[in-house]
Amino acid sequence: MADCITIAPELSFKDQITELAAHLSRSLPNADNQVAVKEFVQGYEAQVDTEEGRGDVEDAKKKQVVKSIVDKFVELKGGLEAAKESEVESSHFLLQHVLSTTFDQASEEYAQAVKDVNEAVKKGAQETTKITRAEAASRVLKNTYNFLPSNSPIRPSTLLSLMSLLASTLDLSALPLPTSTLLPALSSWSIPSSEKVSFLTTASGLYQSTGNLAKALELLTLALKESVEPTVVERAVLLALAVPNKFELDDVLAVQGVKEQLGKVQGVVELFEGDEVEAIEKGKKWTAENVSLIEGAGIPGFTSETVLRKLRLIALVALCTKSETRQLEYAPIAKALAIEESEVETWVIDAVRSKLIVARISQPQSLIRIHSISSITASSRRFGPSEWQLLEKRLEQWKKSVNEARQVVEEAETVAQQGLGQQRRGGKRREEKKEKEDKEEQE
């Protein structure tokens, strides 16, 4: 079977079917019964025998036999049992060759046959207790995807079968799906935009189920670029809120047409666009009124506290941005964030770990000293009249500091020059004194 890819075109149709039947026999419930296995294989041989062994099998008969083989693959859950690992892949390569040469590849019956086999392989992998069988199944689905033409409308469903298998049985992260690879694939698949959206939303759900919320959001954003559907918009906004270290909604809101389809999430979006400190109390009200929306999203780790955490951290960044002295005492932070003073340090540490600010905590003085502020929040990038005024004040302070530093340097240079002059004059007097003493000694 290892050489079936090379020799498949050279095999007769009967031999191809016999090879497939022999492979399937290993997955039979009574596979250890040699008589039953032999009868199983001979049954398929009999179906493709021509009169006196001469001539080709008629096309209609071929299709009937191949459909029977496909049904058996489905019944035996992909036929993943084999004498050696490579046999599973080789047999499925042969099966794909038989399907593509028996049916018109543009026909619905061909597409359905491939999908049925893919689903059977996935199901067999998910139900097996042997990791090697699951790994073999994943390779089969990868090979099937690569066997299909790049524009094949069956590729999306094949890829989803593979992703579903990996997500439930192995490791979805083992299948990198970078945008640079996905976008060309999407554009080449011969499917309508609605099916592309369906693929992307389903794939997003698989990543969400494994806890990779950032990737799930990335795929939903791509889906929105295909078609702005209210349900997808709502899902994308909630996912953006759920991603732990994402503090803005720009990627989603930047898609044309999204802002007009916000629906139920309009209120929470507005919290990220208004006054940062006021947003905390408004956020408490919104989360209390939308518990069913938050819980119904079914996003791992996404709760009302997830939303309030982000609002508080954004408010903290806003306070840091507006501080003229680049330092903040605990009391005003606690008041603005609606927390106890004893909790301030915890929130500052969270902001630092989230790379929103770089700051140092002074416990004796109960204040934080701000070294730098990130631009990854919408509030830190917002620049209005108050920000211009603050910038003007800071520029004046910096200008004053620079002038003072320059004055200190100039004074130091003057002192240094004066000291050098005095040293030179002192040296000359010492030389004159020495000459005088030498002269007196000679006399």
Swiss-Prot record:
GO terms for molecular function: translation initiation factor activity. One of its GO terms (biological process) is cytoplasmic translational initiation. Residues 413-443 are annotated as: Disordered. Residues 205-375 form the PCI domain. It is found in: Cytoplasm. Signal peptide: none annotated. InterPro entries: COPS7/eIF3m (IPR045237), eIF3m (IPR027528), eIF3m_C_helix (IPR040750), PCI_dom (IPR000717). It comes from the Eukaryota. The keyword Disulfide bond does not apply. PROSITE patterns: PCI (PS50250). Keywords: Cytoplasm, Initiation factor, Protein biosynthesis. Residues 429-443 have a biased composition (Basic and acidic residues). The keyword Protein biosynthesis applies. GO terms for cellular component: eukaryotic 43S preinitiation complex; eukaryotic 48S preinitiation complex; eukaryotic translation initiation factor 3 complex; eukaryotic translation initiation factor 3 complex, eIF3m. Component of the eukaryotic translation initiation factor 3 (eIF-3) complex. Belongs to the eIF-3 subunit M family. Component of the eukaryotic translation initiation factor 3 (eIF-3) complex, which is involved in protein synthesis of a specialized repertoire of mRNAs and, together with other initiation factors, stimulates binding of mRNA and methionyl-tRNAi to the 40S ribosome. The eIF-3 complex specifically targets and initiates translation of a subset of mRNAs involved in cell proliferation. This is Eukaryotic translation initiation factor 3 subunit M. It comes from Cryptococcus neoformans var. neoformans serotype D (strain JEC21 / ATCC MYA-565). The lineage of its organism: Eukaryota, Fungi, Dikarya, Basidiomycota, Agaricomycotina.
